[in-house]
Amino acid sequence: MREENVIQETRERALLVGVDTGEEQDFDRCMEELGSLAKACEMDVVGLITQKMESVNKAYYIGTGKVAEVKEYAAECEADIIIFDNALSPSQIRNLQDAIDMPILDRTTLILDIFAIRAQTREAKLQVETARLQYLLPRLVGMHEALSRQGGASGSMSNKGTGEKKLELDRRKIEHRISELKKELEVVEQDRHTQRKRRRNSRIPQVALVGYTNAGKSTVLNQMVEQYVGNGDKKVLQKDMLFATLETSVRSIDTGDNKPFFLVDTVGFIHKLPHGLIKAFHSTLEEVQYADLLVQVIDFSDEQYRQQMEVTRQTLEELGAGNIPMIYVYNKADKCNMNQLPKVMEHQIYMSAVDGVGIFELAELIKSKIYADNEDCTFLIPYEKGAVASYMMENATILEQHYEAEGIYLTVNCHKQDREKYKQYLYK
């Protein structure tokens, strides 16, 4: 099947190719998402070719007859590059490039390229470069243009005729660079570990925002910051684009009742997220593993939101975070003809983060989960134990207080550990 798009701009022109083996729940949606990825990589999609097969061709991924059709159609629509909706093996890339005589990309390379464009911090850049080089290493033959996609390198994926010495030199350079990157990442990861340890020692719960890319996680964090922090400098990049956020950002949220929490914004997930990226970003994604609560942000206006939730579930399982308690934020509900927002239930909330509708209720829902073990109790604290009273003032929610001759009566909502620690002052 063919589809052709007419475009005006003169950017890199991409022809998309996919094979429907029946394994995907919604193959058309997968191809649509591939187009979005290409556009996110600043390409123009000029055409689409799909093929139904029981299984992919080991040599060419598509059928041998389809290869000639792809070559012909690529020339017709003046494509500069061909993108396949799956990870291709090194031999498949080599065979396709030999047969079609055009640069060949797969979905994994495309996602890696987007990550490279979006990476801002030193850690993100190191992680992305590591993932790209590790993916490139076994695909060197016939892929020299891929070297141009590594910082500062040049070449052409379609270049041919390079000898074995050149390939071996390239391989050694890449292996050496990967070794250097891993050493640099170890230093950065140690810093992250120190910061995480400091947060854990504070006993303040950690809440991680997770979910599909572009679901609104950064918008939720920014609205929380605006309402409870009030410092615009603490906001993160918020754009309607795939993978706008690659860095893990942590913000301290204090709603004024001595029930603070750390809110963590994380990189978004996507269907067929490359395993190499998950591995390269493990130190960043580890923040999810250490969370006391996960807040899955869902684009409720997307018809495929259930499939996106399943992708999120599978990715969390792969990260070892599948058993962490979770609440569900059905974001962009204002686009779904829901008149009464926010709508709060036991483990979920329907809201519109971009309008700030439901932020207060979400904060309350979060606190009800992470402080579920808190207890209401009354202490009688002697005046000479002022440090105990000060501790309660700073670390518990004060429900009532009054001063009598024998000391300070404090009725508080506090952590059970604090109740046990100061049980000698409990008022019977």
Positions of predicted regions on the chain:
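Conserved G1/Walker A P-loop phosphate-binding module
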Residues: 11, 149-275
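N-terminal accessory targeting/assembly segments
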Residues: 1-113, 425-426
